[in-house]
């Protein structure tokens, strides 16, 4: 790769343009002059001329946050901020007492004192120069020396100026400085910029109040936050998942917003139809069962009701006390089975007002209550064999009367007599009395004697 060394100072440059600009520092030539009538400054490169033209602009977009002083250029503001730095290192001149914030400014100031006394030697490299201006430019070159090898080097140099960049992309972005193409216009001050990031930075720092006022008028406040501070973002937090049907007793229903309370869940299309509410009479007897709750599952039957042997018992209620078949007075202590209404009971019965769940039996028994016609040809010993009855006694009370069956008398005749002698009413389950129950035939195998009616054990049927 061809290099261009300087014959005067020994510096080497990679491009011809950089070498030419460097030669201007030796020849004191300034080809780029300011066009302002009152300014006669000239510069060695186009870039430095354009940077100087910003000082003639009435718009000072760079403002100090400490003293509100404004500047045309950003580097001027940066140099000014060092005056407000409490940790700054001040370089004071021993001859005149003037202080500088940078080493370069301090050395240049010392070079002026040395040049006034006739000494044009560089204090850094001990190079002797011809004039004071050359000495100042030489001191500036020392400040622009290459950084240490540990840092990243700027290898990509601009073809139009002496600036170097880390990547070629930075070089292409820098080219707008040389082309002068400014396609980005500020909507507040009509200032134009060659790069979009420069316009964004200018808008945030200079017209932040105008942006806020415009956003308040249009109602678009969210876009203002993104424009002013891209790192600040508004994030909408979703509500935590919460069951809509939560009870108010847990103290969480009050914390839900009003929109959640107003939500209603529509049932699915294939959902089952809701259960019919219970009657008021059953709901009063069972307050724990809500009207909308499904009924509890029914218990399985102990016996197969489809069998022909037990088909007459299919319409009867489930298992009750077997001893009550022989003594009707035992049913006085049994609870009722959820009557739908007290008016549906048999007229011969009425609920006791003092004791809920008991039946007051009338003193007079209807004559047709136990007038049953039971054929004596059917054998119900398999059905009655599982009953455990007390041993035979000489006298057994059936209600308040005594029933005596002889060996030669038939059961229907004795049951008819029982209806005339019995003073206690028959058992009623719901609205069905004992005379209306479809009881199966009862065998007439009874032991002889003058005692009460004794139902036999299973082995008595084979005697």
From Swiss-Prot:
Keywords, in A-Z order: Activator, Diabetes mellitus, DNA-binding, Metal-binding, Nucleus, Repeat, Transcription, Transcription regulation, Zinc, Zinc-finger
Pfam families for this protein: zf-C2H2 (PF00096)
Family: Belongs to the krueppel C2H2-type zinc-finger protein family.
GO cellular component assignments: Golgi apparatus; intracellular membrane-bounded organelle; nuclear body; nucleoplasm
Chain ranges of zinc fingers (C2H2-type): 4-26, 32-56, 62-84, 91-113, 120-142, 156-178, 184-207
Chief location: nucleus
Source domain of life: Eukaryota
PROSITE patterns membership: ZINC_FINGER_C2H2_1, ZINC_FINGER_C2H2_2
Record-linked Gene3D superfamilies: Classic Zinc Finger
Taxonomic source organism: Homo sapiens
Annotated protein name in UniProt: Zinc finger protein PLAGL1
Zinc-finger as UniProt keyword: yes
Region (Disordered): 268-306
């Amino acid at each position: 790769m061809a290099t261009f060394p300087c014959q005067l100072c020994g510096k080497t440059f990679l491009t011809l343009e950089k070498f030419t600009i460097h030669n201007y520092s030796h020849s004191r030539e300034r080809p780029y002059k300011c066009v302002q009538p009152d300014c006669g400054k000239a510069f060695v490169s186009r870039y430095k001329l354009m940077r100087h033209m910003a000082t003639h602009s009435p718009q000072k977009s760079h403002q100090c946050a400490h003293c509100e002083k404004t500047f045309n250029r950003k580097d001027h503001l940066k140099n000014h901020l060092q005056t407000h730095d409490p940790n700054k290192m001040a370089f004071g001149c021993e001859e005149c007492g003037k202080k500088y914030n940078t080493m370069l400014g301090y050395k240049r100031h010392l070079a002026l004192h040395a040049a006034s006394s006739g000494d044009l030697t560089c204090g850094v490299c001990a190079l002797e120069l011809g004039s004071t201006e050359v000495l100042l430019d030489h001191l500036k070159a020392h400040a622009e020396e290459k950084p240490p090898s540990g840092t990243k080097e700027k290898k990509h140099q601009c073809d139009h100026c002496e600036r170097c960049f880390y990547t070629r992309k930075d070089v292409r972005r820098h080219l707008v400085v040389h082309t002068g193409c400014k396609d980005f216009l500020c909507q507040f001050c009509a200032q134009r910029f060659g790069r979009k990031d420069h316009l964004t930075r200018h808008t945030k720092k200079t017209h932040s109040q105008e942006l806020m006022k415009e956003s308040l008028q249009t109602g678009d406040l969210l876009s203002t936050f993104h424009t002013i501070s891209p790192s600040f973002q508004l994030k909408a937090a979703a509500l935590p998942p919460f069951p809509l049907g939560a009870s108010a007793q847990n103290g969480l229903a009050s914390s839900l917003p009003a929109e959640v309370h107003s939500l209603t869940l529509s049932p699915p299309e294939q959902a089952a139809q809701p259960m019919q509410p219970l009657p008021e009479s059953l709901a009063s007897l069972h307050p724990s069962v809500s009207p909308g709750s499904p009924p509890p599952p029914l218990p399985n039957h102990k016996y197969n009701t489809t069998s022909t042997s037990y088909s007459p018992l299919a319409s009867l209620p489930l298992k009750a006390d077997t001893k009550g078949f022989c003594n009707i007075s035992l049913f006085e202590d049994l609870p009722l089975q959820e009557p739908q209404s007290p008016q549906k009971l048999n007229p011969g019965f009425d609920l006791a007002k003092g004791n809920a769940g008991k039946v007051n039996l009338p003193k007079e028994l209807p004559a047709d209550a136990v007038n049953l016609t039971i054929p004596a040809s059917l054998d119900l010993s398999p059905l009655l064999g599982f009953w455990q009855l007390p041993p035979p006694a000489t006298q057994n009370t059936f209600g308040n009367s005594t029933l005596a069956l002889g060996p030669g008398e038939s059961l229907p005749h004795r049951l008819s007599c029982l209806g005339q002698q019995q003073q206690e009413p028959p058992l009623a389950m719901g609205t069905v009395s004992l005379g209306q129950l479809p009881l199966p035939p009862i065998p007439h195998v009874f032991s002889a004697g003058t005692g009460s009616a004794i139902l036999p054990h299973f082995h008595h049927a084979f005697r």
